[in-house]
Amino acid sequence: MRLPRRLKIKRFHKPSCSSILPKYPGCPFSLNLSLSFLNFTHYDVHLQMINRFFPNVYYSVVIPIILLSTSYSAKIAPKCRDTDMNCAVWVATNTSDCENVELVNSHCPRTCQTCGEPIDPKYDVKLLPAKLKSIAWMVGRWRSEFGGKAFFPTIPKFTYGEQVDITIADNSQDTHTPLLNYTAFAWDINMPDGDPTEIHSENGYIAVEYDKEQEKEYVSLNTAMSNGFMTIEEGESGPNQVKFRLQRIGRISFSHDSAVRIMFREWTLLDENRLEARLLMTTTITRRLMEHTAVIYKKIYP
């Protein structure tokens, strides 16, 4: 039987799976090869070619198309991720829900750790003390490469990158006031490649207290900043959201006086992978409340 004129065959050594897919040595998965035939009447010739040169390859026949083409694809497991923004709070509130509640089991495989690598204990919401369970959605490493926007009448507008880490403090289980560690690092995206140039950083703690008389839950954030200021902020906690208001501000003795009079910091979980942060303030110059920074982070761990 003669081959179609259009089909040109060159002799070559039988390839190994690793030579076909150098990124996957040993090829621990099945390889799919599909061929579109020039002429269906010669399909048996093509099958003979496949059997000769690719004896261990699974193939599928695609009936007549105009051009001859080959393609392969690796069967890779689906990404291990949660599909509901409430997963952290659900699992923190009742860890047994991972096994006993179908909704949690099916939508929260990463938080339940039914797939992927084990989660670092600092980020494992199953280990959260009872007081912190309502803000379990905060826990994680959040990052925006270049999505931060800063604007205010007294400064030029600019864009920045920022990473926020919120983890379980080491001694949270042993203290009367369990805490989350909070760190934030912002950098100038306009600098040359290399180590990012810091423009601002913050380090502090997050705590939760329930007011029985008012039947409200309050969240506090106290921070020390790289510009020499220290702040204490408090606010009410809501479902996947908290709005802090500045209560106290201090500074080192040789730092300039703060012009901030009122400040609000809002954190809102938009979905299972995105956290929005906004900061609004009024100063001795502006006199009215205005937005100062806004950024949407992507969750990069766990």
Swiss-Prot record:
Q: Which cysteines are joined by disulfide bonds?
A: 80-115, 87-108, 98-112
The record, for Pfam families, names:
ShK, THAP4_heme-bd
Q: Please indicate which superkingdom the organism of origin belongs to.
A: Eukaryota
Please give the Gene3D superfamilies that the UniProt record associates with this protein: 2.40.128.20
Which CDD domains does the record cross-reference, listed alphabetically?
Answer: lipocalin_heme-bd-THAP4-like
Glycan attachment points: 32, 39, 94, 181
* Assigned keywords, A-Z: Disulfide bond, Glycoprotein, Signal
Q: Where in this chain does the record put each ShKT domain?
A: 80-115
InterPro entries listed in its UniProt record: Calycin, Nitrobindin, ShKT_dom, THAP4-like_heme-bd
Q: Please identify the protein, giving its name as recorded.
A: Uncharacterized protein C28H8.5
The record lists the organism as Caenorhabditis elegans
